[in-house]
C-alpha cells in the first residue's frame, strides 16, 4: 500500500472539509439593514434577502424600515458618538449625501474596491461613492431622468412625437408657449423653492456645485448659469404652473393640469397611476442646454448600499451585496417589473423586462430608453454640501426672475454658500 499517497489524500480531504466548515460558519449570522420606503427600498431588499437565503439558509436578515430622515439621524448620531454597536451592518444612503458621510467619518465604511467588480456598474454611480481611489458602496437604483409628455395635449397644439425628439431648452420653451396658448395647459409644474430642475440641468451639462477638489464651483459654472437662466425664462414666459411642495406637483401631474413632467425614472409609477390617461403619454430624452459639452441625460435622486466597517457580519454583508446586487441579473428584471426600479448594473439592461412595450406609453419600451440614457449621465462630484447649495440657489433665484443680472445672482449664491459651509 502507498501510505504516502493515502496520507496526502487524507490531509487533502481534511483541509477541504475544514474549508467547507469555515465557509459555512462565515455565513451564519444575522445581517441588519436600515432603509426607508416600504414599497420600494424595503420591499426590494426583502426580495434580495430571500434570494440569498435560498443558497445560504443559515443567514438571517433583519430589515428595518425607518423614515429617511430617521435613517440619516441615527446614522449620524452613531458615527459621531463612536457607538458603532448601535449601527446596522448595511445602510442605505442617498447618493447626494454619500461623500458627506465618507469624508466626515473616514474609516467608518468598508472599502469594497477589491471585493466587487465595479466595472459592471454605471460610472457616475461608482464615482459618487469613491474617495481617494477606494469605492465604498454598492450602486442601487438610478435616478436617470426623462421627459414624460401628454401626446394628446401636444397634438392639440399641432405637435407630433417627432417634434419632441432632440430637444433644446429653447425649443422646449417655444413648444410650451404654444401648448399653453392652444390648450390652456402649462407645459410643466415648477416649485421654485425646490432645486431639482436646476440640478438636473446642471448635471446634464457635466458640472455640479463643486469642483473635483471640493471647492465651490459657482461663478465660473457655465452649466449652473445656463440652468438658472433657463428656469427664469420658464417662469417669466409662463410655461410652468407654479406649485408648492411635492404633493402639489404630483396633483398637477395626475389631474391633467400640465402637459409634461421632467423627473427621475422613479416618477413612472405616479405617471401611470391614472388608468384613464393610458395611451396619452410618451417619453423622450430631456432637453439640452446651449453650452459646450451639454448632454440630454441627467440624474435626480437615487441611493446606494454601504457596509459599516465595524460590522461583526461585514464579510457576510459584502458577500450578500456582491452575490445579489452585482451578479443576479434576474433580480433586476423582477424589481423592474414589480417595483419600477431601474438598477445601475449595466448587464441587466438586456433583459426581457427592459424590452417589453408599455401600452400606457403608446407601446414605447420606456425601460429600455432609461437603460440607454443611464450610461450617458455625466459623472460629477456631489460634494458634501449639496443641500446647503440648494438653499442658496433657491434663496437667490427670485432676484433673477425680477431682473437681477445672472452674474450678480451667481456671486450672491457663492457668498451665501461660503458662509453656510464654513
Curated annotation (Swiss-Prot):
Residues 1-28 form the signal peptide. The keyword Transport applies. It is found in: Periplasm. One of its GO terms (cellular component) is periplasmic space. It comes from the Bacteria. Its main location: periplasm. Keywords: Periplasm, Signal, Sugar transport, Transport. Induction: By lactose and various galactosides, and subject to catabolite repression by glucose, galactose and succinate. In strain AR50 the expression of the lac operon is constitutive. Residues 246-277 are annotated as: Lactose-binding. Part of the binding-protein-dependent transport system for lactose. Belongs to the bacterial solute-binding protein 1 family. This is Lactose-binding protein. It comes from Rhizobium radiobacter (Agrobacterium tumefaciens). The lineage of its organism: Bacteria, Pseudomonadati, Pseudomonadota, Alphaproteobacteria, Hyphomicrobiales. The gene is lacE.
